[in-house]
């Protein structure tokens, strides 16, 4: 490809609204342009990268025996009603009505559609297992799109769904997908960590996210450097260090705390640590009022709570709603007032420790409150607090380390949530009807592209892994007159005929501008031919990742091709 025939709108300045490297560089390198909040146009260079990632995904999926489909983006509301997710998906799902007042969703995911499609196609255990997938545009009405294409409202996703006669078969495919995902991300040049994750509205018994450690990540990962345990903090069980702490207040007594409603305010006033207090969190879901008590220095983990109570979402109660339940905001006692509210106690709490708690009385707290003495029939405590760095590994009790991460892939064991909802049954080996079990496997293609840039950039721009670079080789020519131009064209044609992807910058621009553009865009290999070649036969070849340039005297096209192929193979080998 010749740059003179290409749309190549590179920019020197960073866009004002881009706060992360991938967003800045995708704009500056001419890969994308913004349409509106969370929506992007893909330009030719950016589209080439996307298509290469898609092809890697397709090759690895096909190698496992998965079958590619293409389903409608519009999905009827009936499908979602049948699974119970029309309301559970919340406001993130785009919903539209046609001229006949029929409701549809712009598909954010396709469990329902594939279940509907596969039900009449699967008759017997002999048809199983089957793994089906598509690579398609998805939609989510993100309330705050950010970080360019990392969190956008429209995105390309590979979503796969497997159907099985039993859990053993599901586990085989789950593990095969786990291996395939590592291969996909390795081939894309991404270093990923599989971590245990919460299944959320997807449902199911188990899931793992493929995370890329990055300071801009929106997820918190908890990693064990001793045994290799890794988990999203949303999923990590909380195991606290054992501390020989003695309470400041052992005698039970009501104390005045005027206007002090927060844990920080109360602990400061009384001179106690926040871990000696009990925090009350009042929430409401669609059908429940919820009151959670946990140690004052900890935060509630909503994902654990929702999973435990089998609810889709919750939100804080207002002060008025709290008072209507007979409670005093900021001064709530751990003693449940009535059966109108679901009460949970986090397992961070010690039953025999004298805590500072609310008194159910305006401007008063109680010191020396011991749960097992004050609450009759104390229920089993639940794990609903958020684990943090320094808490203990659930496998080996080594302190956990926290890292921020970007999710690029997610695999789920869905169980029979959708197959039951859609009545997907086959005849087993004994001729009896059996409900199938499912798996689900997703990869964000655009997000993978952006995350590669987050890992592969420097002060000059992007340095693409050669497997997904828009072009493998940049040929920069610095010529005067047609004779020199035609000589360089001979180099271009030879490389192209050897099957090497070449982007020839033949624009009538200064050498500095061309060289900076090639480094900004991030072509893995650059060949520069200019004045020195026409004087002494000297050519330079540049490795963008290493930022290393070597010069040699041209001795023939075979030698040049061999040098390029050697560098290509070196760059591909680094991805393995």
Swiss-Prot record:
Q: Please give the positions of the paired cysteines in each disulfide bond.
A: none
Question: Which Gene3D superfamilies does this chain map to?
Answer: Anticodon-binding domain, Bira Bifunctional Protein, Domain 2
Q: Which GO terms describe its biological process?
A: prolyl-tRNA aminoacylation
Q: Which Gene Ontology cellular-component terms appear in the entry? A: cytosol
Q: Which InterPro entries would you find in this protein's record?
A: aa-tRNA-synt_IIb, aa-tRNA-synth_II, aa-tRNA-synth_II/BPL/LPL, Anticodon-bd, Anticodon-bd_dom_sf, Pro-tRNA-ligase_IIa, Pro-tRNA-synth_IIa_bac-type, Pro-tRNA-Synthase_IIa_type1
Q: Which Pfam families match?
A: HGTP_anticodon, tRNA-synt_2b, tRNA_edit
EC number(s) per entry: 6.1.1.15
Report the principal subcellular site: cytoplasm
Q: Which UniProt keywords apply?
A: Aminoacyl-tRNA synthetase, ATP-binding, Cytoplasm, Ligase, Nucleotide-binding, Protein biosynthesis
Q: Which reaction does it catalyse?
A: tRNA(Pro) + L-proline + ATP = L-prolyl-tRNA(Pro) + AMP + diphosphate
Q: Name one GO molecular function term.
A: aminoacyl-tRNA deacylase activity
Q: How does it assemble?
A: Homodimer.
Q: Domain notes, please?
A: Consists of three domains: the N-terminal catalytic domain, the editing domain and the C-terminal anticodon-binding domain.
Give the record's family classification: Belongs to the class-II aminoacyl-tRNA synthetase family. ProS type 1 subfamily.
Q: How is this protein named in the record? A: Proline--tRNA ligase
**What is the originating organism of this protein?**
Leptospira interrogans serogroup Icterohaemorrhagiae serovar Lai (strain 56601)
């Amino acid at each position: 490809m010749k740059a003179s025939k290409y749309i190549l709108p590179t920019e020197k300045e960073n866009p004002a609204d881009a706060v992360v490297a991938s967003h800045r560089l995708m704009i500056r390198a001419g890969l994308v342009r913004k349409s509106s909040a969370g929506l992007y146009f893909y330009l030719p260079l950016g589209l080439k990268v996307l298509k290469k990632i898609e092809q890697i995904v397709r090759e690895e999926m096909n190698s496992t025996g998965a079958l590619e489909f293409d389903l409608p983006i519009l999905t009827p509301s009936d499908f979602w009603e049948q699974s119970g997710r029309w309301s559970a998906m919340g406001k993130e799902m785009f919903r539209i009505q046609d001229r006949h007042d029929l409701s549809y969703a712009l598909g954010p995911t396709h469990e329902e559609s594939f279940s509907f499609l596969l039900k009449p196609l699967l008759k017997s255990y002999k048809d199983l297992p089957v793994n089906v997938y598509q690579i398609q545009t998805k939609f989510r009405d993100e309330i705050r799109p950010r970080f360019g294409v990392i969190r956008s409202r429209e995105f390309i996703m590979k979503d796969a769904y497997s159907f099985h006669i039993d859990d053993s078969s599901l586990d085989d495919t789950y593990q095969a997908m786990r291996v395939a995902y590592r291969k996909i991300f390795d081939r894309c040049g991404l270093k990923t960590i599989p971590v245990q994750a919460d299944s959320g509205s997807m449902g199911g018994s188990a899931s793992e996210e493929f995370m890329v450690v990055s300071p801009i990540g929106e997820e918190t990962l908890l990693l064990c450097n001793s045994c290799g345990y890794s988990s999203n903090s949303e999923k990590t069980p909380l195991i606290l260090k054992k501390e020989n702490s003695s309470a400041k207040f052992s005698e039970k007594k009501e104390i005045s705390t005027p206007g002090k409603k927060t844990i920080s305010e109360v602990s400061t006033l009384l001179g106690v640590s926040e871990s000696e207090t009990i925090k009350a969190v009042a929430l409401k879901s669609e059908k429940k009022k919820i009151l959670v008590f946990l140690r004052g220095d900890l935060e509630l983990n909503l994902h654990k709570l929702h999973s435990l109570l089998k609810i889709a979402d919750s939100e804080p109660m207002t002060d008025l709603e709290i008072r209507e339940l007979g409670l005093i905001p900021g001064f709530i006692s751990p003693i449940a007032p009535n059966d109108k509210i679901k009460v949970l106690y986090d397992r961070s709490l010690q039953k025999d420790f004298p805590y500072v708690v609310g008194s159910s009385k305006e401007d008063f707290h109680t010191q020396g409150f011991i749960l097992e003495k004050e609450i009759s029939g104390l229920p089993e405590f639940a794990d609903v607090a958020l684990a943090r760095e320094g808490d203990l590994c659930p496998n080996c009790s080594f302190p956990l380390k926290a890292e921020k991460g970007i999710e690029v892939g997610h695999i789920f064991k869905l169980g029979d949530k959708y197959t039951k909802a859609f009545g997907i049954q086959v005849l087993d080996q004994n001729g009896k009807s059996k409900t199938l079990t499912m798996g689900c496997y997703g990869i964000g293609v655009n997000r993978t592209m952006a995350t590669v840039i987050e890992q592969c950039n420097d002060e000059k721009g992007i340095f693409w892994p050669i497997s997904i670079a828009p072009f493998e080789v940049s040929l920069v020519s610095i010529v005067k007159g047609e004779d020199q131009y035609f000589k360089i064209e001979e180099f271009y044609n030879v490389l192209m005929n050897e099957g090497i992807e070449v982007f020839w910058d033949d624009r009538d621009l200064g050498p500095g501008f061309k060289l900076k553009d090639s480094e900004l865009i991030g072509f893995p290999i650059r060949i520069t031919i200019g004045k020195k070649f026409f004087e002494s036969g000297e050519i330079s070849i540049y490795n963008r990742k290493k930022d290393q340039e070597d010069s040699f005297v041209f001795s023939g096209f075979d030698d040049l091709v061999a040098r390029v192929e050697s560098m290509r193979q070196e760059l591909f080998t680094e991805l393995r």
